[in-house]
């Protein structure tokens, strides 16, 4: 499934102070724990391999997008079905120009990436030249199924 949202940077307000403090603590925790999980790093590498194969630059990992994606992949695994977040900007406390989201599940990260690339809408997000940042969350459920969330962003 894919979801795209576009906005101007002037239409967003800053996150309340409490959310900003919580986000700072979460970022510090992720950095202290070694940033992204090995599965997330692998899934991100697969995205960047797909981009490179199509003449596009690699996307940089955005820790805030990673935290959102990782949390949401756990939600999907717990819920047991795929569904998009209703507000892609929720949890981002700074300006953005464009956001995109891919969600999927499967038996391996490679299988999911191949399915994304075979789907025009998912492929469009992965190969969108305007995106410059990514966060990928991966959760493996008790049955061994991988739940992947790819969050894309164009920063001003």
Describe the predicted segments one by one:
Residues 37-77:
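A short alpha-helix/helix-coil micro-patch that ends at or immediately precedes a cysteine
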Residues 1-16:
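N-terminal secretory signal peptides that target proteins for export/translocation
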Residues 105-156:
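Disulfide-stabilized extracellular recognition modules
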Residues 23-32:
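Bacterial N-terminal signal peptides
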Residues 66-113, 126-128:
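Short, surface-exposed glycine/acidic/tryptophan-bearing loops
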Residues 36-37, 53-61, 98-106, 110-113, ...:
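Second-shell loop/turn segments in exported
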């Amino acid at each position: 499934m894919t979801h795209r949202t576009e906005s101007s940077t002037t239409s967003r307000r800053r996150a309340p102070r409490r959310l900003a403090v919580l986000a700072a603590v979460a970022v510090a925790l992720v950095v202290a724990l070694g940033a992204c999980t090995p599965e997330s790093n692998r899934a991100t590498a697969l995205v960047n391999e797909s981009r490179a194969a199509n003449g596009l630059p690699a996307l940089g990992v955005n820790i805030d997008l990673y935290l959102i994606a990782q949390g949401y992949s756990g939600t999907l695994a717990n819920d047991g079905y795929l569904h998009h977040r209703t507000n892609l900007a929720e949890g981002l406390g700074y300006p953005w120009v464009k956001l995109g989201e891919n969600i999927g599940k499967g038996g391996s990260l490679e299988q999911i990436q191949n399915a994304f690339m075979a789907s025009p809408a998912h492929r469009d997000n992965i190969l969108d030249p305007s995106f410059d940042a990514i966060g990928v969350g991966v959760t493996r459920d008790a049955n061994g199924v991988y739940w992947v969330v790819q969050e894309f962003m164009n920063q001003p």
